[in-house]
Amino acid sequence: MSKSLSWDDLKCEIQPWIRTAIESMGFETMTPVQASTIPLFSGNKDVVVESVTGSGKTIAFVIPILERLIKEEANSAKFKKSHFHSLIISPTRELASQIHDVIEDFLKYYPDNLYPIRSQLLVGTSSASVRDDINSFTDNRPQILVGTPGRVLDFLQKTNVKTASCGTVVLDEADKLLDLNFQKDVETILKMLPKQRRTGLFSATIESAGAQIFKTGMRNPVKVAVKSNSSAPSSLSINYIVIPPKDKLQLLLTLLNNYRFKKCIVYFPTCISVTYFYAFINHLKELNLIQDDLKLFSLHGKLQTQSRMKTLDSFTSNLTDAVLFTTDVAARGIDIPDVDLVIQLDPPTDADIFIHRCGRTGRANRIGKALVFLNEGREEDYVPFLEVKNVKLEEESVELKGVENLTKIFHDWILHDRARFDHSVRAYVAFIKYYSKHTASSIFRFHSMDFIGVANFYGLLRLPRMPEITRYAADQIPEEGWLVSPPVNLDTFAYLDKQKEKARLQELQNLKQISDKKKLKSELKKKNMAWSDKTLTKEAKAERRAAMAIKRKAIEEKLLRGDEESEDEVEQDWKDLVRQNKKKKHNSMQGSFDDL
């Protein structure tokens, strides 16, 4: 079932204003998942919905929620104070915000003469506390709540909020919500809601949730699985490029400079990698080595919520060519118009996330392309591994046409500020830890990782001291770990930030003073030792050496004479010799202490 259908063919009636809203938003036809889900979820069925990314799952649950809410309003005039009707939970703030925006877009067409329907977004922000959410809930009396698990749980636990009237709950990206990171909060929330309710689970990879599905309190759920020859939509092509780690940055710059796209999302493995490469590639842009009209954005989970929302809104509404550097915080569910290229510098630790990342492009039957970089060798086995999950990848080759003298430019940029040197090391260490936790460890083997190649990708001047590197790549480590020649004088390598540099110099001075004190103390100890003690020490050592020599000579003579003494006895003599030597040494040391 791959073709789109007319809204006239929907097997249930929907409100005229909802139909107007759908057409005004440009959804002239419905997708298979919408045609299958809306009639079931609008009625009295719990649903488990699995469909490829970009297939319209959000609208498939928003319309039933609105339909059920309108029926409830008609039957009970209006909801009691402190009660709500529907709850939608998503794993990220960005996705929750997007779902809330979709609901608000529908409500723009809601008739003014009817009792107002309102929605409220519940996500943690630095500017809004749970108390602020409660005040807004009390004042506006919304019937639909949309939020992330932690904030929703905090909200529902307040005495001002009553859950008895909640008739519908939706878990969007349900497999993520039911994994170990969110499972406890989600199960607690579900236990607080009425048992007589409608529950909907939605995801592109719902099967990975396994037995956890049965803990959501559904009653005889209907599974809606839209069949496809691939886990990705037909409008999306997924390709891989085999490239050594040291050339990954050059390949990325080649694609950004030469590939035609309107919007591109580049996925990095860690938050610090995003900020690090965002800063450096902006530097290349200032040098006119990246196309001038390309606008860069960065987004990751360590940013404040308001900053994340603002960045996402800016990237979404940007009219010129734009690139978003991000982590998996922007991998699930987020619908950004006009994204026609997705680049993954490294495969994610979870194969399901790979599908979600790719699904940010090729949405709603638009043409999209997803690329993933794989290291030469073992990592190429990732391709057949994904085929088992019904994801087919085609190899692609790209001629490197990035930036000349890139390594020198990279190192010069780092040498301009010691903070960048620190940043490069932290980014490298974070990646090492990330790679070591890969779930497909049979493919992404930590011990066979190209530690030096990855270090070159991150522009490292010197390898950090890490047990992982010492254990698996000791033979690859250059002298003192330096990857540049000549080595950098770390005593004079300064921070641009005056306060940080002042603190560094102070610490350097303190360390020098401590070192000088230790050196002076050692010299004084040697200098102040009594001449008689020195003589006794020398004489004791000479006596031990002489005794050892006599014993050794006696044993050697035994062996030469061929005495009938067994090998065990000879070995025992050697052991006695060593034992006596240790005992004398111990007694000598003990005597020195006793004399104090």
From Swiss-Prot:
ATP binds at residues 51-58. GO terms for cellular component: nucleolus. It is an enzyme of class 3 (hydrolase). It comes from Kluyveromyces lactis (strain ATCC 8585 / CBS 2359 / DSM 70799 / NBRC 1267 / NRRL Y-1140 / WM37) (Yeast). ATP-binding RNA helicase involved in the biogenesis of 60S ribosomal subunits. Binds 90S pre-ribosomal particles and dissociates from pre-60S ribosomal particles after processing of 27SB pre-rRNA. Required for the normal formation of 18S rRNA through the processing of pre-rRNAs at sites A0, A1 and A2, and the normal formation of 25S and 5.8S rRNAs through the processing of pre-rRNAs at sites C1 and C2. This is ATP-dependent rRNA helicase SPB4. Residues 497-558 form a coiled coil. The keyword rRNA processing applies. The Q motif is unique to and characteristic of the DEAD box family of RNA helicases and controls ATP binding and hydrolysis. It comes from the Eukaryota. A motif (Q motif) lies at residues 7-35. It is found in: Nucleus, Nucleolus. GO terms for molecular function: ATP binding; ATP hydrolysis activity; RNA binding; RNA helicase activity. It catalyses: ATP + H2O = ADP + phosphate + H(+).
